[in-house]
Amino acid sequence: MGSTLPLAAASAHGFAVATLVLGGLLVLGALLSGLAGRSFLSLTAVFVIAGFALGDGGLGVLAFSPRSPFVAQLALVALVVILFRDGLEVEAEMLQKAWHLPFRKLALAMPLTALLVALVTRALVGLSWTESFLLGALLSPTDPVLSSAVVTNPRVPRIIRHSLNLESGMNDGLALPAVLALSAALGAGSGHFVWWEFVLQDLGVGLVTGLLVGALAARLLPRGRRLDAEMPAHQKSLFALGTAFATYGIAVLPPKGNGLIAVFVCAITLGILRPDVRLYFEQRAEDIVEIVKLGIFVVFGSLLTLHGLFGEGWAAVAVVAFTLLLARPLAVLVALAGTGTDGATKGFMAWFGPKGVATMTFALLVLSQNIPAGSRIFNLAALAVLTSIVAHGLTDTPGSEWLARRAEARPRAVLSSAAD
């Protein structure tokens, strides 16, 4: 009895600290949201810095183990919610008319980015080829959270918003099989691992599950006046969130498909068959998405230490700089060659490939496995994410406004030339 009282007191203290931090950061985020919209300040950067200051690298108030199942599961929940929201944003009209740009980036730019990162990592850091390709796979996806300032700006041309949104949503799920396959190859018993069967099963089951559950959810949801009569407004967003998590759960059950791809495909299917769901989700579920985003970035920040981030010295800085400034931009420019896309659009999409939740989640999954170089790979990925949060956070709002002004100036230029 005596031993349980200190344990209960410690648990209560930890819960009190967690609620204090969560409440304080929610208030801070709300107060700074207007400032962030008018300046280069990124709320994501604020939350990560707050997590770092409160974590082991700072005051030590937040103490999370990177190998804790809680951390990996929180990141996974964040991906499910965010991918589902982004999938609902995919419009059928744009999917039919403008599929070629995101497809080229997924099929060409993504693997080329991973290859370039792997080559430089092998040369500068000295990881094995498999470990280097694992880091390349971790850094190949872009982040739907950090892309939100662009894809939610209605003044930015729809083709750019659609391309970035579809790319950032799909490449999270597409990168996961490669991450897990390479992790398994580095682990024990890798001699019995057949990678192509693994990838085929993950992709196939995930895709089919997403299509079937999305179609079923669209059919179950009442239509027209019956919908308003039988389902209150707040229950419609709960229906959508429930569909997201149910899809993930079904997909990862035997025969074990890719739950993230299933969630995104389900959201696309549901959004196309029932466009009204998109409005319900935007009106009621955005607060949940924001809280999940806040939580994952604060936890991520609390796991960072200066010693870990710069454990590889200047080689780590060089790998991160190459990834953000050369690997992604070069890969996208190669992928978009011959598409007829203007130079400004190519340049913006080449630069805007932020690293965030997906890379964090996958790095945490790698760290939780018995991989000798797991900590080194995690810290390199973490430094890339932190640098990307700052760099892309500083440029997302100014960049989207520049694109918007440029797009709005085009019709006036055409009218002026016609009048002349």
Task: Name these PLM-found stretches.
Residues M1-D420:
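Transmembrane helical cores of multi-pass secondary ion antiporters/exchangers
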